């Protein structure tokens, strides 16, 4: 079978299966599996495709038709211009999260602190932690993750991007984890850091019931945020405040309807200068504030 005919068959398969991004997905599969980008398709569309390669392509297309996320099929996805390995058991990096990273970087640029100590909670692939370390080379960055399924991806992505990120396996809602982290300083007091950053699970129970078949493939542990979606914001804002310096930054990615609620949580938990920022689609996406000085 020639390249252009295989392309047409693949795209029509995805279209018939209801894949909205059928053309984009077909392009990605062809480039990844056959090494055929749009230029190749235009110039060499009559090229014969070896049967084993066509079979691999069809197998991948069938998985996509059944709802498996494109990113899981490819095994990698880009975030902030860098590659990250992904697969079943880890949340797929999304453009919305880049807004969180941009705002955190902007904060430290404006403050003149280019060597902050940062904790990325619910790290998953490590896309936030790795990006912050690469963009702030003098920073000390910790990535905290509970999931045994996500942990191999986190470690792999740190190595892939040659980022000196320190990995901590643990539950961000466990006060013992924070106490153990604070004890690393050996000074008899809570260790103080400059920022807590997190894209925590924030979907409500109702939203979990209405997920697309693609998102249902992603780990529930990384998605479900309790009945109202705010469980992790409440806990992190309270527990992790103890190891933030006075004036230290807390920054969250949020669901598009959660801006007011998360802002209220932070203000009631001892933070000031709390602001809500929008993503490029105009939806509330990030909430940031700074720790009030303890009196």
Range-by-range predicted roles:
Residues 1-34, 39-41, 46-49:
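Non-catalytic accessory regions of SAM-dependent methyltransferases
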Residues 14, 108, 158, 240, ...:
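Conserved hydrophobic residues forming the short capping helix/wall of the S-adenosyl-L-methionine
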Residues 29, 67, 97, 128, ...:
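Residue-level signal for inorganic ion chemistry
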Residues 30-107:
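Conserved AdoMet
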Residues 71, 203-206, 257:
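Active-site beta-alpha loop architecture of Rossmann-like, nucleotide-cofactor-dependent enzymes
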Residues 98-209:
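Conserved SAM/SAH cofactor-binding pocket of Class I
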Residues 202-231:
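Mobile active-site "lid"/loop adjacent to the S-adenosyl-L-methionine
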Residues 227-290:
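Conserved Class I SAM-dependent methyltransferase catalytic core
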């Amino acid at each position: 079978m020639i390249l252009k005919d295989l392309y047409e068959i693949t795209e029509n398969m995805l279209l018939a299966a209801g894949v909205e991004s059928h053309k984009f997905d077909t392009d990605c599969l062809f480039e990844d599996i056959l090494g055929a980008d749009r230029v190749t398709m235009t110039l060499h569309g009559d090229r014969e495709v070896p049967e084993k390669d066509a079979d691999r392509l069809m197998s991948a297309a069938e998985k996509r038709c059944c709802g498996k996320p494109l990113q899981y099929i490819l095994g990698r996805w880009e975030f902030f211009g860098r590659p990250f390995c992904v697969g079943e058991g880890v949340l797929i990096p999304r453009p919305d999260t880049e807004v969180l990273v941009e705002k955190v970087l902007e904060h430290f640029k404006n403050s003149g602190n280019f060597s902050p100590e940062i904790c990325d909670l619910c790290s998953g692939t490590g896309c936030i932690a790795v990006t912050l370390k690469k963009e702030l080379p003098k920073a000390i960055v910790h990535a905290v993750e509970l999931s045994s399924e996500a942990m191999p991806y986190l470690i792999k992505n740190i190595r892939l991007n040659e980022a000196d990120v320190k990995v901590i396996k643990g539950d961000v809602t466990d006060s013992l984890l924070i106490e153990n982290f604070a004890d690393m300083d050996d000074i008899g007091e809570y260790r103080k850091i400059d920022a807590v950053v997190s894209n925590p699970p924030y979907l409500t129970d109702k939203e979990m019931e209405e997920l697309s078949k693609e998102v249902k493939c992603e780990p529930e542990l990384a998605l479900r945020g309790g009945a109202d979606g705010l469980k992790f914001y409440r806990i992190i804002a309270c527990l992790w405040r103890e190891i933030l310096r006075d004036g230290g930054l807390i920054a969250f990615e949020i669901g598009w309807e959660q801006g007011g609620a998360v802002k209220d949580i932070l203000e009631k938990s001892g933070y000031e200068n709390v602001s809500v920022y929008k993503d490029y689609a105009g939806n509330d996406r990030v909430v940031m504030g700074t720790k009030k000085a303890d009196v």
